[in-house]
């Protein structure tokens, strides 16, 4: 676990296991960014339209958000948690997340 994780009580997440168990990866980058490369099987729901696209994400699934660097995915996590999604993880940048799954 990282120093920041220890300081702020954040637990480490096994993204590979979550994906194997059926987690949905939501990539909140723009369609153009998504077309330039993405994680196989991920769903592209841009942050600016996420609120109107919530019906496309099952509430009974674990959700992992990702973007280019982790900023938009953090915002997306907040949107999803506020909408009642129970298990949501900020996977950060998509390339980093891809290396973890």
What are these regions (language model features)?
Residues 67:
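Short cysteine clusters
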Residues 2-24, 31-62, 71-101:
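Rhodanese-like catalytic fold shared by cysteine-dependent sulfurtransferases
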């Amino acid at each position: 676990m990282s120093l920041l994780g220890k300081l702020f009580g954040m637990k480490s997440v096994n993204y590979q296991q979550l994906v194997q168990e059926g987690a949905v990866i939501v990539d909140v980058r723009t369609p153009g960014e998504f077309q330039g490369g993405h994680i196989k099987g991920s769903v592209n729901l841009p942050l600016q339209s996420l609120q109107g696209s919530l019906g496309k994400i099952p509430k009974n699934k674990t959700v992992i958000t990702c973007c280019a660097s982790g900023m938009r995915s953090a915002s997306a996590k907040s949107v999803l948690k506020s909408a009642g999604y129970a298990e949501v993880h900020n996977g950060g940048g998509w390339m980093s997340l891809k290396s973890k799954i």
